[in-house]
Amino acid sequence: MRKIPNHGTLRMTKVAYPLGLCVGLFIYVAYIKWHRASAAQAFFTIAGAASGARWTQQAFSSPGSAARGHEVFYGIMFDAGSTGTRIHVFQFARPPGETPTLTHETFKALKPGLSAYADDVEKSAQGIQELLNVAKQHIPYDFWKATPLVLKATAGLRLLPGEKAQKLLQKVKEVFKASPFLVGDDCVSIMNGTDEGVSAWITVNFLTGSLKTPGSSSVGMLDLGGGSTQITFLPRVEGTLQASPPGHLTALQMFNRTYKLYSYSYLGLGLMSARLAILGGVEGKPAENDKELVSPCLSPRFRGEWEHAEVTYRISGQKAVGLYELCASRVSEVLRNKVHRTEEAQHVDFYAFSYYYDLAASFGLIDAEKGGSLVVGDFEIAAKYVCRTLETQPPSSPFACMDLTYISLLLHEFGFPGDKVLKLARKIDNVETSWALGAIFHYIDSLKRQKVPAL
């Protein structure tokens, strides 16, 4: 119990003593009632939200945070990608009447990805358990039963046959159910591309503070992965909503507000899948009769092998005049009629991630550690330089000309002019700009809405 400070010695008469005792007792009772009420307010009940989940658990503020009036809660998100499985342990704090803030993140990754255990699902449990131990180490014991635990799988499991993928997910679910954390029936799933884009949009706008103030300007999100690419932003022009093709709009509810987002994932237009298409290959199939795939986008003297989606291809460059023009022509063929262009996008501030960042950093367009800003035209300038000097100054990667040309033309197809500024970042306020934060935050928010009408 909090100690009431003594501000001086009280000299009480026999008559005043009973009165003083009553006053003291009244203060004590009032304090106890206040303490219990504060503790009750610090609880937030998470009720089962989706897919028949059944639970009613309670989370509460740690003593230090409760003293500041902040509600503390945690969330655990597993990112099951194609090359590895990563755990993110997030700690949030919510001041009274305000939106939550991220106060701490713990991250750990293990290789290989879950898909590597497709033929022996039992072996997948060891890595999952190891990562769960990380969560136990960084989340106070009293919070375990109220901390949501979720796994979202991306490209790696999407490429597996359905039966194998489901067996892996079922094994993960068994391990999760045996853990001390809060687990619903929807605790493991394979993300679709749009969900990935929306979750990344939440992450960026949460970290930049755009979600905290109603009516504040939000930022758009561009993500270029290996198999797909996503674009997500919040339209302010009614014409954008009316002209959007089916499947390009999605509703997001956060903080008791509904956002109608323009969001679409282009499967097959991720950088690795685009490489294969530019080379003339077919996804998931070896070249006919082991034919060598030749492209003007590769270094003229290059000849070698390239593996994609567990298929190995023989590839080589070709000698020709005007390699950039030939490469750009081929890339344009691959992109033709594949991307929907919206006029409003050029007027929205965008962050770009993943391979956009990696390529820009590799060729000195931004600082490799800190990130930075560039204009879309910088990718075209870099592409022309690299492609036109392939023969005299071969780059370290034989795909440099192809990749830069592809990114340049992809951004053009999205409707961005050459002078459009993009912000490239791996971290915002020292937090990874991945979809994981947005996904767990949205999950927790949706659970809370089932019990509490306002955050």
UniProtKB/Swiss-Prot annotation:
N-glycosylated. Disulfide bonds join 297-327, 387-401. PROSITE patterns: GDA1_CD39_NTPASE. It comes from the Eukaryota. It is found in: Golgi apparatus membrane; Secreted; Cell membrane. Its cofactor is Mg(2+); Ca(2+). It catalyses: a ribonucleoside 5'-diphosphate + H2O = a ribonucleoside 5'-phosphate + phosphate + H(+); IDP + H2O = IMP + phosphate + H(+); GDP + H2O = GMP + phosphate + H(+); UDP + H2O = UMP + phosphate + H(+). Pfam families: GDA1_CD39. GO terms for cellular component: cell surface; extracellular space; Golgi apparatus; Golgi membrane; plasma membrane. Its EC number is 3.6.1.6. Keywords: ATP-binding, Calcium, Cell membrane, Disulfide bond, Glycoprotein, Golgi apparatus, Hydrolase, Magnesium, Membrane, Nucleotide-binding, Secreted, Signal-anchor, Transmembrane, Transmembrane helix. The keyword Ribosomal protein does not apply. Gene3D superfamilies: 3.30.420.40, Exopolyphosphatase. Domain 2 (3.30.420.150). Residues 33-455 are lumenal. It is an enzyme of class 3 (hydrolase). The chain crosses the membrane at residues 13-32. Its main location: Golgi. The active site is at 196 (proton acceptor). InterPro entries: GDA1_CD39_NTPase. It is a single-pass type II membrane protein. GO terms for biological process: response to calcium ion; response to magnesium ion. GO terms for molecular function: ATP binding; CDP phosphatase activity; GDP phosphatase activity; guanosine-5'-triphosphate,3'-diphosphate diphosphatase activity; IDP phosphatase activity; nucleoside diphosphate phosphatase activity; ribonucleoside triphosphate phosphatase activity; UDP phosphatase activity. Belongs to the GDA1/CD39 NTPase family. Catalyzes the hydrolysis of nucleoside triphosphates and diphosphates in a calcium- or magnesium-dependent manner. Has a strong preference for nucleoside diphosphates, preferentially hydrolyzes GDP, IDP, and UDP, with slower hydrolysis of CDP, ITP, GTP, CTP, ADP, and UTP and virtually no hydrolysis of ATP. The membrane bound form might support glycosylation reactions in the Golgi apparatus and, when released from cells, might catalyze the hydrolysis of extracellular nucleotides. This is Ectonucleoside triphosphate diphosphohydrolase 6. It comes from Mus musculus (Mouse).
